[in-house]
Structure formats: structure tokens, C-alpha cells
């Protein structure tokens, strides 16, 4: 991947959702919503405060995160659909 996020932005790859419900019903791809979970592939260096000091991000590469349905900007890189979003658009980190 040749994308390097700037400031407080992160690159996220959406994780595939289950296409079958707990009761065994298969959800067709056309009816499925976009997943709201993803894995962080790259992080920017962080914002700068009023004095110019860098504020590091709370997320790191490999974190599994939750984000809003309309969060981020979709980009295609090497045939993969990725999201570029600000750290503030991330709602939570999924603990393993």
C-alpha cells in the first residue's frame, strides 16, 4: 500500500460482515449494509497542539475499530476499497 495518512488521519480496511444470521438466514449481498468495523492499516503522526508539539493518536496499526456508517472518504488502492478518516470518526476499539 502506498498511502501515508497525514495529521490525525488513519487508513482503515472494512471487515466483512456475516452474511448469515444466527438463525441461519442468508443475507443477499445487495441487501447487506456496509460493515461498520475495520482494521487500521496505517496511522498519521497526529495533530499538533497550540505550542507545536505533536499529539500521538490513541489507535495503532492492527487495531479493530468501530466507526459510523458514513465515516471517512472511500479510496481504491491496488483494487482494494479503503477508508481514510480522522481519528475522531472512530467510536471505539474492539478489544480482543
UniProtKB/Swiss-Prot annotation:
One GO MF term attached to the UniProt entry: protein folding chaperone
NCBIfam families associated with the record: PRK00364.1-2, PRK00364.1-5, PRK00364.2-2, PRK00364.2-4, PRK00364.2-5
UniProt keyword terms in alphabetical order: Chaperone, Cytoplasm
Subunit structure: Heptamer of 7 subunits arranged in a ring. Interacts with the chaperonin GroEL.
Major location (coarse): cytoplasm
Localization of this protein: Cytoplasm
Coiled coil: none
One cellular component term from this protein's GO annotations in UniProt: cytoplasm
Function according to Swiss-Prot or TrEMBL: Together with the chaperonin GroEL, plays an essential role in assisting protein folding. The GroEL-GroES system forms a nano-cage that allows encapsulation of the non-native substrate proteins and provides a physical environment optimized to promote and accelerate protein folding. GroES binds to the apical surface of the GroEL ring, thereby capping the opening of the GroEL channel.
Name of the featured protein: Co-chaperonin GroES
GO biological process: chaperone cofactor-dependent protein refolding
InterPro entries for the chain: Chaperonin_GroES, Chaperonin_GroES_sf, Chaprnonin_Cpn10_CS, GroES-like_sf
Superkingdom in the source lineage: Bacteria
Family, similarity comment: Belongs to the GroES chaperonin family.
Gene3D superfamilies linked: GroES chaperonin
Keyword set includes Chaperone: yes
Amino acid at each position: 500500500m502506498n498511502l501515508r495518512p497525514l495529521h490525525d488521519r488513519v487508513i482503515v480496511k472494512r471487515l466483512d460482515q456475516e452474511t448469515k444470521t444466527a438463525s441461519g438466514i442468508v443475507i443477499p449481498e445487495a441487501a447487506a449494509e456496509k460493515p461498520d468495523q475495520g482494521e487500521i492499516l496505517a496511522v498519521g503522526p497526529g495533530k499538533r497542539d497550540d505550542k507545536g508539539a505533536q499529539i500521538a493518536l490513541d489507535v495503532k496499526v492492527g487495531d479493530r475499530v468501530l466507526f459510523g456508517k458514513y465515516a471517512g472518504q472511500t479510496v481504491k488502492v491496488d483494487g482494494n476499497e479503503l477508508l481514510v478518516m480522522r481519528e475522531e470518526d472512530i467510536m471505539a476499539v474492539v478489544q480482543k
